[in-house]
Amino acid sequence: MQGLIAAVLMLAAVPAAAAEAVMIPNFWNPRARLERPEPPQTTRPIRFLTDDEYPPLHFAGPDGNPTGFAVELARAACEKLGLTCTVQVRRFDTLLDALQANQGDVVAAAIPLTAALRADHRATRPYFRWPARFAVRGDKSLPAPDTKVVSEHPVGVVSGTAHEAYLRTFFHATPKTYPDLGTAEAALRRGEIEYLFGDGLALALWIGGTEAAGCCAFSGGDYLENRYFGEGIGFVTRKEDEALARALDDALQRLWDEGKYAELYLRFFPVGPF
């Protein structure tokens, strides 16, 4: 874990010029403008809960304090709403229980948005999603992947994953399967496969990290089908805290409109997963 955090911090130091080609996702409809809600009236700080072991979304910074894309987005939302907020670290599997026990007010962590989650909690619109992507070796002039291309070239995927199911269903591929992503990435680097289909965030961290040694790059676009790859993540509140959830949704929209979202995204995703 420390090695992964170090890699994220090194990536975050990439000069701005190197990040110019990063595609910044937009999860907000510019035509859908809700009436601006009033921030919740409170005399105490809003308590955000997070975990510190999932870079680059949330992790412990060099000073030991929580940081990451989700954490800094939460802080920016608080500033936009004029609210005083704190960020408290909990073990990931205890975050929702801590929220329900009133030990915090909002969860800012990589908890997937699902119907089951919404049955017991409120959540903002997603501010991040996990795209699926194809990676290729950079020294080969391979065509962008499509059904024909994938059927004619060796492609790898992690066995038993949504990515394997998607590849077989929509690309009619017969991929070479691997037990984990690290093994599949090593196979791509060695040239045993020509395409690797997997989680865009994990692949972005690998492509920009030392283990890839500059071997590989993304090819083609992103794949975001909810049924396979989920709805993403948003800020999660208790069911009764509708005013807070609505205010956070409004803050996220404004952070996107004003460019703050893009600034934070480039800071934590210099090699973009999209």
Where are these regions (language model features)?
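Bilobed "Venus flytrap"/periplasmic-binding protein-like clamshell domains
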Residues: 52-55, 64-79, 111-112, 133-185, ...
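Residues that mark the start of a beta-strand
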Residues: 45-47, 153-154, 234
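Extracytoplasmic/secreted envelope proteins and their assembly/folding machinery
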Residues: 70-78, 92-96, 100, 104, ...
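Ligand-binding clefts/hinges and TM-proximal coupling segments of bilobed small-molecule sensing domains
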Residues: 19-30, 162-178, 217-219, 249-274
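Periplasmic-binding protein-like
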Residues: 52, 128-136, 204, 208-253, ...
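N-terminal hydrophobic or amphipathic helices and topogenic motifs
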Residues: 1-86, 262-274
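Beta->alpha turn/N-cap motifs
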Residues: 49-54, 88-93, 102-114, 138, ...
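Acidic, polar ligand-binding/catalytic clefts
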Residues: 23-30, 71, 75, 79, ...
